[in-house]
From Swiss-Prot:
Name of protein: Probable DNA ligase
Family named by the database record: Belongs to the ATP-dependent DNA ligase family.
Cofactor(s) needed by this chain: Mg(2+)
SUPFAM superfamilies (alphabetical): ATP-dependent DNA ligase DNA-binding domain, DNA ligase/mRNA capping enzyme, catalytic domain, Nucleic acid-binding proteins
EC annotation from Swiss-Prot or TrEMBL: 6.5.1.1
Organism: Beutenbergia cavernae (strain ATCC BAA-8 / DSM 12333 / CCUG 43141 / JCM 11478 / NBRC 16432 / NCIMB 13614 / HKI 0122)
GO molecular function term, any single one: DNA binding
Residues involved in ATP binding: D217, R224, R239, E268, F306, R377, K383
General function of this protein: DNA ligase that seals nicks in double-stranded DNA during DNA replication, DNA recombination and DNA repair.
Keywords assigned: ATP-binding, Cell cycle, Cell division, DNA damage, DNA recombination, DNA repair, DNA replication, Ligase, Magnesium, Metal-binding, Nucleotide-binding
Disulfide-bond pairs as recorded: none
Superkingdom: Bacteria
CDD domains linked to this entry: Adenylation_DNA_ligase_Arch_LigB, OBF_DNA_ligase_Arch_LigB
Name of the gene this protein is made from: lig
Keyword Magnesium applies: yes
Length: 512
């Protein structure tokens, strides 16, 4: 398939705010894609490169050849070029990578160059996130969307699922092919996510099931982990399905000692002090990211688990939470997250207050009769924090003045628009320490795309957790809302911009 066809569809998707129209355009493209190209096409319309990292930075895209007159690039050749770039290492690799990029862009038309720039920078912004692409795969294959989503949950990726569904002779064969994707110990599953509520009472009201007892978990201030155990072999994955097994030997040893031969557990890992209180999140995040043996030895991470997806040959994804917790208690023992089972909101509120006093983030209120809805913000999990917080994306940043002179300080905050792009909600420099100012100055200069007299404009990649006292109507920002007394809590390097809170979530919090 020509890259020009993908670029044309990307433009069509960007040109409409209608989710149905976006879905139809992508489905039409997928129907036309040859089987060998489907995985590449799916990645490109979702705004991603299959290689994830190619070594090309934004500055590499500033001085490239002009566009070609006629389209000639095949998506398979483009994918092979990016794969070759990703494999380059050692002396001379930067020069070789730049030469390969120049050759690729010289063969691309203006429309194709725009697509390639968006893929390399992660800034395609046409509103075709993975969930929409999965729905388009379902349309193209003529199968129910839940079948596709379930297969992608187990596969941990959209590409193989799309290829299997679209290669089938018809809808019945496609459903059969999709049913072949099952939970496999050793292969990461997309994690279930929680919706939000402003308080415990509201969380109870949102859950299905009426007066049935719920499970109230302490929400730990750590990093999300998913562990897979097959005998003595243990693998540890992050929220984004990155394999960090080699960086966390202490977690591997803890899981290896659990009394089960095969396990898939969902949980959190965090560093704790001598009194058992969580250390600052940035320390936990830095520890999980380091490959430095001395740093790793100086601070250990402790795993705590809140769900069990598989135990000794028994898949539990479709089992109700109460059954999964029974198995979890039997296999994970002291590594189980503290929880309360109750139908009394007042008791849950007391539990929430105690968790916050102990330095934790809050609680997650869970319906006990629901399955594990991997890859989705399921209706069965509702998180509650002691303050209003949002995970937003930094869109630009201003140079500081006074004590903050010389540092990039005042950050512009945006919520994700499901239709594409970001909606600005305000600015803040509140809550920033000197250490944070120094770190973000270096980080944001790496993300710079342009600048004017006052601000440095960024690739929208850095997620930041913001606390605020409320939301107010505002004509100053395009979303019609602004944050009141916004302040920085921490940078969330464990989250991508695609996982940031949406403008719809913000409007719900504002009561709109």
């Amino acid at each position: 398939m020509l890259l020009a066809e993908v670029a044309a569809t990307s433009d069509a998707v960007a040109a409409t705010r209608s989710r149905l129209a976006k879905r139809a355009a992508i489905a039409d493209l997928l129907r036309r894609a040859p089987a060998d190209d489907v995985e590449i096409v799916v990645a490109y319309v979702a705004g991603e490169l299959r290689q994830r990292r190619t070594g090309l930075g934004w500055r590499s895209l500033r001085d490239l050849p002009g566009p070609a007159e006629d389209p000639s690039l095949e998506v398979a050749d483009v994918d092979a070029t990016f794969a070759a770039m990703a494999d380059l290492a050692g002396p001379g690799s930067a020069t070789a990578r730049a030469a390969a990029a120049a050759e690729l862009f010289a063969a691309a038309t203006e429309r194709e160059q725009a697509l390639l720039r968006g893929l390399v920078s992660g800034e395609l912004r046409q509103g075709a996130l993975d969930a929409l692409v999965l729905d388009a795969v379902a349309d193209a294959a003529g199968v129910p969307a839940p079948e596709v989503r379930r297969a992608a949950m187990f596969a941990g990726a959209t590409g193989p699922v799309a290829r299997a569904a679209l290669a089938a002779a018809g809808p019945a064969e496609a459903v059969a092919a999709l049913s072949g994707f099952m939970l496999t110990v050793g292969r990461a599953v997309r994690p279930m996510l929680a919706q939000s509520a402003p308080d415990v009472a509201a969380a109870f009201a949102k859950l299905p099931g009426g007066d049935v007892a719920v499970s109230v978990d302490v929400k730990l201030d750590g990093i999300r982990i998913q562990v897979h155990k097959a005998g003595d072999e243990v693998r540890v994955f992050t929220r984004s399905l990155d394999d960090i097994t080699g960086r966390v030997p202490e977690i591997v040893e803890a899981v290896r000692a659990l009394p089960a031969g095969a396990l898939v557990l969902d949980g959190e890992a965090l560093a704790v002090d001598a009194g058992g209180r969580p250390r600052p999140f940035q320390e936990t995040a830095s520890r999980s990211a380091t490959r430095d043996a001395d740093v790793a030895a100086a601070m250990t991470l402790t795993p705590f688990f809140f769900d069990c997806l598989h135990a000794d040959g028994r898949d539990l994804v479709d089992a109700p939470l109460r059954e999964r917790l029974e198995v979890l208690d039997a296999v994970a023992g002291p590594h189980v997250v503290t929880r309360l089972t109750t139908s009394d909101p007042a008791a849950a509120e007391e539990f929430f207050a105690a968790a916050v006093r102990d330095g934790q983030e809050g609680v997650v209120v869970k319906a006990t009769d629901t399955p594990y809805e991997a890859g989705r913000r399921g209706a069965g999990w509702i998180k509650v924090k002691p303050r209003h917080t949002l995970d937003l994306v930094v869109l630009a940043v201003e140079w500081g003045s006074g004590r903050r002179r010389g540092w990039l300080s005042n950050i512009h905050l945006g919520a994700r628009d499901p239709a594409g792009g970001f909606v600005m909600l305000g600015k803040t420099f509140k809550g920033m320490t000197d250490e944070m100012l120094a770190w973000q100055t270096e980080r944001f200069l790496e993300l710079e795309t342009s600048r004017d007299e006052w601000a440095v404009h960024l690739r929208p990649e850095q997620v930041v957790e913001i606390a605020f006292d409320g939301l107010q109507r505002s004509t100053r920002y395009p979303g019609g809302l602004a944050l009141r007394f916004a302040r920085v809590l921490r940078y969330r390097d464990d989250k991508t911009a695609a996982e940031a809170d949406t403008i719809d979530t913000v409007r719900t919090l504002a009561g709109l």
